[in-house]
């Protein structure tokens, strides 16, 4: 009995096709482009982030993850509400080939535990 079917890939990708590569190319081409905004929880003020600033932050976080022993293929659990920092960590994971595994603040304790057990 057939238990698993893995179809041939519809197309191939390269390192130039990753979300990190897209960010990197954009930052190199137009570093001053507005790419994100975030709101300070205390002051409620909005802050602009340029492509160059975001790339620098992503690279810094990626280096920190590497320093913690994260490498290509590692799984990194991100427990956070949706925010700018979540995106930075997600891009940093992509930059080093790690897999980001989100746990959302709306997930129940049981759901979160199940996700962590799988990792």
Residue ranges and their predicted role:
Residues 1-19, 39:
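Flexible, non-catalytic linker and terminal segments flanking ANL/adenylate-forming cores
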Residues 6, 29, 60-62:
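Sequence-pattern detector for short linear motifs
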Residues 31, 72, 100:
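Conserved loop-to-beta-strand segment in the C-terminal subdomain of adenylate-forming
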Residues 97:
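Structured binding elements
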Residues 103-106:
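Short beta->alpha connector loops at strand-helix junctions that form conserved
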């Amino acid at each position: 009995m057939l238990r698993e079917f893995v179809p041939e890939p519809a197309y191939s990708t390269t390192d130039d096709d990753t979300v990190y590569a897209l960010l990197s190319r954009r930052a190199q081409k137009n570093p001053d482009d507005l790419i994100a905004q975030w709101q300070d929880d205390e002051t409620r003020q909005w802050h602009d982030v340029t492509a160059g600033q975001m790339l620098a932050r992503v690279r810094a976080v990626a280096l920190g993850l590497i320093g913690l022993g994260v490498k290509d293929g590692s799984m990194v659990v991100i427990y956070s509400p949706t925010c700018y920092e979540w995106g930075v960590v997600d891009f940093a994971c992509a930059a080093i080939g790690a897999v980001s595994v989100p746990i959302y603040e709306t997930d129940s304790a049981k759901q979160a535990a199940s996700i962590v057990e799988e990792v």
